[in-house]
Amino acid sequence: MRVIELLDKPAVRYEVTEHPPAFTAQQMAAAEHEPGKYVAKPVIVKADGKYMMCVLSACYKIDLGALKNQLGAKSVELAEEKEIGEIFDDCELGDGPPFGNLYDLPTIMDKALETDDHITFQAGTHEKAIRMSMDDYRKLVEPKILEFSYHMTS
Protein backbone atom coordinates (compact mmCIF):
# COMPACT_ATOMS: atom_id res chain seq x y z
CA MET A 1 0.00 0.00 0.00
CA ARG A 2 1.42 3.36 -1.07
CA VAL A 3 0.55 5.18 2.15
CA ILE A 4 2.51 2.76 4.38
CA GLU A 5 5.51 2.99 2.05
CA LEU A 6 5.39 6.80 2.27
CA LEU A 7 5.07 6.83 6.06
CA ASP A 8 7.93 4.35 6.52
CA LYS A 9 10.43 6.31 4.41
CA PRO A 10 10.87 9.40 6.59
CA ALA A 11 10.38 7.34 9.76
CA VAL A 12 7.17 9.14 10.66
CA ARG A 13 5.55 7.93 13.88
CA TYR A 14 2.15 6.42 13.17
CA GLU A 15 -0.12 3.72 14.49
CA VAL A 16 -2.13 1.21 12.47
CA THR A 17 -5.22 -0.18 14.18
CA GLU A 18 -7.77 -2.78 13.11
CA HIS A 19 -11.51 -2.39 13.51
CA PRO A 20 -14.74 -4.03 12.31
CA PRO A 21 -15.54 -3.22 8.67
CA ALA A 22 -16.42 0.47 8.27
CA PHE A 23 -17.72 1.86 5.00
CA THR A 24 -17.94 5.56 5.89
CA ALA A 25 -15.68 7.92 7.81
CA GLN A 26 -18.35 8.27 10.50
CA GLN A 27 -18.54 4.47 10.89
CA MET A 28 -14.77 4.33 11.19
CA ALA A 29 -14.80 7.09 13.82
CA ALA A 30 -17.27 5.03 15.87
CA ALA A 31 -15.29 1.80 15.38
CA GLU A 32 -12.07 3.56 16.42
CA HIS A 33 -13.76 5.35 19.36
CA GLU A 34 -12.42 8.57 17.86
CA PRO A 35 -14.34 11.86 17.67
CA GLY A 36 -15.38 12.52 14.07
CA LYS A 37 -13.50 15.82 14.06
CA TYR A 38 -10.18 13.91 14.10
CA VAL A 39 -11.15 11.44 11.36
CA ALA A 40 -10.25 12.69 7.91
CA LYS A 41 -12.10 11.73 4.78
CA PRO A 42 -10.81 12.46 1.30
CA VAL A 43 -13.37 13.69 -1.21
CA ILE A 44 -12.34 13.70 -4.86
CA VAL A 45 -13.71 16.57 -6.91
CA LYS A 46 -13.25 17.83 -10.44
CA ALA A 47 -12.57 21.56 -10.62
CA ASP A 48 -12.78 22.78 -14.20
CA GLY A 49 -12.23 19.17 -15.27
CA LYS A 50 -9.11 18.57 -13.12
CA TYR A 51 -9.15 16.13 -10.21
CA MET A 52 -8.35 17.40 -6.72
CA MET A 53 -8.43 15.80 -3.30
CA CYS A 54 -10.32 17.65 -0.59
CA VAL A 55 -9.68 16.49 2.97
CA LEU A 56 -12.26 17.23 5.64
CA SER A 57 -13.46 15.90 8.99
CA ALA A 58 -15.80 12.91 9.06
CA CYS A 59 -18.50 15.01 10.72
CA TYR A 60 -18.40 17.71 8.04
CA LYS A 61 -19.86 17.93 4.54
CA ILE A 62 -18.19 19.55 1.57
CA ASP A 63 -19.60 22.86 0.34
CA LEU A 64 -18.96 22.74 -3.41
CA GLY A 65 -20.06 26.36 -3.85
CA ALA A 66 -17.58 27.63 -1.27
CA LEU A 67 -14.84 25.49 -2.80
CA LYS A 68 -15.64 26.78 -6.29
CA ASN A 69 -15.45 30.39 -5.08
CA GLN A 70 -12.18 29.90 -3.20
CA LEU A 71 -10.56 28.11 -6.13
CA GLY A 72 -11.85 30.67 -8.61
CA ALA A 73 -13.14 27.76 -10.68
CA LYS A 74 -15.97 27.84 -13.21
CA SER A 75 -17.25 24.44 -12.10
CA VAL A 76 -16.65 22.03 -9.22
CA GLU A 77 -18.35 18.64 -9.01
CA LEU A 78 -17.89 15.39 -7.13
CA ALA A 79 -15.98 12.68 -8.98
CA GLU A 80 -17.94 9.56 -9.96
CA GLU A 81 -17.44 6.32 -8.00
CA LYS A 82 -15.79 4.69 -11.04
CA GLU A 83 -13.30 7.56 -11.31
CA ILE A 84 -12.49 7.30 -7.61
CA GLY A 85 -11.85 3.56 -7.96
CA GLU A 86 -9.43 4.24 -10.82
CA ILE A 87 -7.57 6.89 -8.82
CA PHE A 88 -7.24 4.75 -5.66
CA ASP A 89 -6.20 1.63 -7.56
CA ASP A 90 -4.36 0.19 -4.54
CA CYS A 91 -7.27 0.57 -2.10
CA GLU A 92 -10.70 -0.84 -1.43
CA LEU A 93 -13.38 1.44 -2.88
CA GLY A 94 -14.11 4.29 -0.51
CA ASP A 95 -11.01 3.77 1.62
CA GLY A 96 -8.35 5.89 -0.05
CA PRO A 97 -6.01 7.75 2.31
CA PRO A 98 -5.96 11.58 2.39
CA PHE A 99 -2.63 11.81 0.56
CA GLY A 100 -3.28 13.40 -2.82
CA ASN A 101 0.47 13.52 -3.45
CA LEU A 102 0.48 9.71 -3.69
CA TYR A 103 -2.01 9.90 -6.55
CA ASP A 104 -0.68 13.00 -8.35
CA LEU A 105 -3.57 15.10 -7.05
CA PRO A 106 -3.40 18.57 -5.52
CA THR A 107 -4.57 18.29 -1.90
CA ILE A 108 -6.77 20.85 -0.22
CA MET A 109 -7.40 20.50 3.51
CA ASP A 110 -10.35 22.12 5.22
CA LYS A 111 -9.47 24.78 7.76
CA ALA A 112 -11.54 22.95 10.41
CA LEU A 113 -8.81 20.26 10.55
CA GLU A 114 -5.94 22.72 10.80
CA THR A 115 -5.73 22.98 14.60
CA ASP A 116 -6.18 19.27 15.37
CA ASP A 117 -3.16 17.64 17.02
CA HIS A 118 -3.60 14.36 15.16
CA ILE A 119 -5.40 12.84 12.20
CA THR A 120 -6.95 9.40 11.73
CA PHE A 121 -7.89 7.94 8.36
CA GLN A 122 -8.65 4.70 6.52
CA ALA A 123 -5.50 2.79 5.58
CA GLY A 124 -6.79 1.63 2.20
CA THR A 125 -9.07 -1.08 3.59
CA HIS A 126 -12.41 -1.16 5.39
CA GLU A 127 -10.75 -2.74 8.47
CA LYS A 128 -7.63 -0.65 9.17
CA ALA A 129 -7.00 2.91 10.26
CA ILE A 130 -3.86 5.00 10.58
CA ARG A 131 -3.37 7.61 13.31
CA MET A 132 -0.54 10.14 13.08
CA SER A 133 0.31 13.67 14.16
CA MET A 134 -1.21 16.51 12.16
CA ASP A 135 2.22 18.16 11.96
CA ASP A 136 3.69 15.09 10.25
CA TYR A 137 0.69 14.84 7.92
CA ARG A 138 1.06 18.47 6.88
CA LYS A 139 4.82 18.07 6.30
CA LEU A 140 4.28 15.02 4.08
CA VAL A 141 1.30 16.28 2.08
CA GLU A 142 1.73 20.08 2.14
CA PRO A 143 -2.00 20.67 1.61
CA LYS A 144 -3.44 24.02 0.65
CA ILE A 145 -5.74 25.20 3.47
CA LEU A 146 -9.19 26.54 2.52
CA GLU A 147 -12.63 26.76 4.16
CA PHE A 148 -15.03 24.56 2.21
CA SER A 149 -17.11 22.51 4.64
CA TYR A 150 -19.90 22.74 7.16
CA HIS A 151 -20.71 20.63 10.21
CA MET A 152 -23.35 17.96 9.69
CA THR A 153 -26.31 18.18 12.02
CA SER A 154 -27.87 15.07 13.49
Which positions does each model-derived feature cover?
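Extended, low-hydrophobicity, polar/charged segments
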Residues: M1-S154
